[in-house]
């Protein structure tokens, strides 16, 4: 289940880039304009898999807890889930662990995408190394324009159904919540208090796997959540705001 993106982009374009309130995102996911990388550069990254197939990204919080997006865990049971850590490839290498349980944020709303965060507990414990590391949670948001990176195994082009075997990443810049909701961009009131945005000129506005990490300053600042297609420069990628949701993660981990 990859990142949310509007498929009806022609509708938004016809409306001059304004997205109608309540228009629901559709499923798609990609890292466009990025580059292949290795897990040692993003050792907190994991592949969340359903029945052995890559489904979403996630970030290592502790030896047995993963942070991901709540929308990745809709209509699924823990028994069909596993994670792969420590590998640049979602289908091989590293280590795999089955999932013992997961919990979505109680305030998650699939219509508005508020509180789009979840934790996963695995059976067993990860052994930390150069390719498997936990990442800290942001306690405050980076400044508007701050450098950040997004990683994952998202598809490489719009509408593609295939995903790359090797981990990809893109460099982006933070767009603050207030800026993302301003008239500079097309989201308006759809940007809520539990969201933060990021974008980069010349790169797709909707990078990354759902649930995957947005990292700035060496800490996890966002969880890949959703975004609209059409005029990409006018629609940054939208992420769950880790600083705003930090206390929930800590109390439930």
From Swiss-Prot:
<dbReference type="InterPro" id="IPR043504">
    <property type="entry name" value="Peptidase_S1_PA_chymotrypsin"/>
</dbReference>
<dbReference type="GO" id="GO:0005829">
    <property type="term" value="C:cytosol"/>
</dbReference>
<dbReference type="Pfam" id="PF00089">
    <property type="entry name" value="Trypsin"/>
</dbReference>
<dbReference type="InterPro" id="IPR001254">
    <property type="entry name" value="Trypsin_dom"/>
</dbReference>
<keyword id="KW-0865">Zymogen</keyword>
<dbReference type="InterPro" id="IPR018114">
    <property type="entry name" value="TRYPSIN_HIS"/>
</dbReference>
<feature type="disulfide bond">
    <location>
        <begin position="56"/>
        <end position="72"/>
    </location>
</feature>
<dbReference type="InterPro" id="IPR001314">
    <property type="entry name" value="Peptidase_S1A"/>
</dbReference>
<feature type="signal peptide">
    <location>
        <begin position="1"/>
        <end position="22"/>
    </location>
</feature>
<feature type="active site" description="Charge relay system">
    <location>
        <position position="71"/>
    </location>
</feature>
<keyword id="KW-0732">Signal</keyword>
<keyword id="KW-0964">Secreted</keyword>
<feature type="domain" description="Peptidase S1">
    <location>
        <begin position="31"/>
        <end position="253"/>
    </location>
</feature>
<keyword id="KW-1015">Disulfide bond</keyword>
<dbReference type="GO" id="GO:0004252">
    <property type="term" value="F:serine-type endopeptidase activity"/>
</dbReference>
<keyword id="KW-0720">Serine protease</keyword>
<dbReference type="GO" id="GO:0006508">
    <property type="term" value="P:proteolysis"/>
</dbReference>
<protein>
    <recommendedName>
        <fullName>Trypsin delta</fullName>
        <ecNumber>3.4.21.4</ecNumber>
    </recommendedName>
</protein>
<feature type="active site" description="Charge relay system">
    <location>
        <position position="116"/>
    </location>
</feature>
<comment type="similarity">
    <text>Belongs to the peptidase S1 family.</text>
</comment>
<keyword id="KW-0378">Hydrolase</keyword>
<dbReference type="InterPro" id="IPR009003">
    <property type="entry name" value="Peptidase_S1_PA"/>
</dbReference>
<feature type="disulfide bond">
    <location>
        <begin position="206"/>
        <end position="230"/>
    </location>
</feature>
<dbReference type="InterPro" id="IPR033116">
    <property type="entry name" value="TRYPSIN_SER"/>
</dbReference>
<feature type="active site" description="Charge relay system">
    <location>
        <position position="210"/>
    </location>
</feature>
<keyword id="KW-0645">Protease</keyword>
<dbReference type="GO" id="GO:0005576">
    <property type="term" value="C:extracellular region"/>
</dbReference>
<feature type="disulfide bond">
    <location>
        <begin position="180"/>
        <end position="197"/>
    </location>
</feature>
<dbReference type="InterPro" id="IPR050430">
    <property type="entry name" value="Peptidase_S1"/>
</dbReference>
<feature type="propeptide" description="Activation peptide">
    <location>
        <begin position="23"/>
        <end position="30"/>
    </location>
</feature>
